[in-house]
């Protein structure tokens, strides 16, 4: 009998805590996993107490997932190396802006044969353009990565409301174990091999959701939002066909939870849409609204739009992605939000 696998969750925000609820419960009842699940918590003080202390005594992340009890076998650890050094499975769930620094701290301090799964929605820039977050982790830590993406608004997952998700595996032999770690009766997992397409969907849909929020802020209706979703999906597929080079890009992957389902839920719920709507209504900057509305959580859509803009500019492809470009120009270049509607009206799909 193989020794039970030790699991560490890197991150403890809204999504990290929701996943800790699932992983903790599954590890507690499956002999393939060690009963204790460590969760690295970036230490902060909440009402005069350390967040790790609150989580370990009251079993609740009162800052990022209030009102939900975490399993008692989830142990909050403030030291990243201490949390991750013995893990066989590393679950990455932090804002994509922090991944480089986190991996640098872990480098040389983890098991060589560990495997990783990234739940991080975003992309990085490499010297030749696009770099996937899972590739950044793989290069820095030398471990084989998978990814998990889907229509998974964290609070609904924590409420155990039914949803689906997609795991993309670079090494398909890791799929069954990761599925056992993640799947519950209300969190259904499909495993596919196109890990790069799964991951790119998770990043790009946040840009489209910003556009959906602009439409809401301008008072347009569901027909307009449906057009944003459709045109956004077309740009996501076109982008994947250019930049996902690990293998063929099949349309079927976009019909998984990581694709069209995640795009829909994010364009109707989710923080990117909410903040983009407020951006139109208040005239405040994205940075101001992030501080005011998200209580320490990070917004992924505008930052991803900026990275994608630079990648497309580098490849001379900006004209082929007018929706992505418009979101960037409005968020960062002071262009009027009304430009977003003309971007839809004049989209090359209609020419």
From Swiss-Prot:
**Could you tell me which Pfam families the record lists for this protein?**
NAD_Gly3P_dh_C, NAD_Gly3P_dh_N
GO BP annotations listed: carbohydrate metabolic process; glycerol-3-phosphate catabolic process
Provide the coiled-coil residue spans.
none
Q: Which InterPro entries match?
A: 6-PGluconate_DH-like_C_sf, 6PGD_dom2, G3P_DH_NAD-dep, G3P_DH_NAD-dep_C, G3P_DH_NAD-dep_euk, G3P_DH_NAD-dep_N, NAD(P)-bd_dom_sf
Q: Where does substrate bind?
A: 121, 271-272
Does the keyword Transmembrane helix feature in the UniProt annotation? no
Does Repeat appear among the keywords?
Answer: no
Q: Per UniProt, which keywords does this protein have? A: Cytoplasm, NAD, Oxidoreductase
Enzyme kind, highest EC tier = oxidoreductase
Q: Which reaction is catalysed here?
A: sn-glycerol 3-phosphate + NAD(+) = dihydroxyacetone phosphate + NADH + H(+)
Q: Where does NAD(+) bind?
A: 11-16, 121, 154, 271, 298, 300
Enzyme nomenclature, EC number: 1.1.1.8
Catalytic residues (UniProt): 205
Q: Annotated Gene Ontology MF terms?
A: glycerol-3-phosphate dehydrogenase (NAD+) activity; NAD binding; protein homodimerization activity
Classify the main location: cytoplasm
On assembly, the entry states:
Homodimer.
Functionally, this protein is described as follows:
Has glycerol-3-phosphate dehydrogenase activity.
Q: What is this protein called?
A: Glycerol-3-phosphate dehydrogenase [NAD(+)], cytoplasmic
Q: Which organism is it from?
A: Takifugu rubripes
The UniProt gene name for this protein comes to gpd1
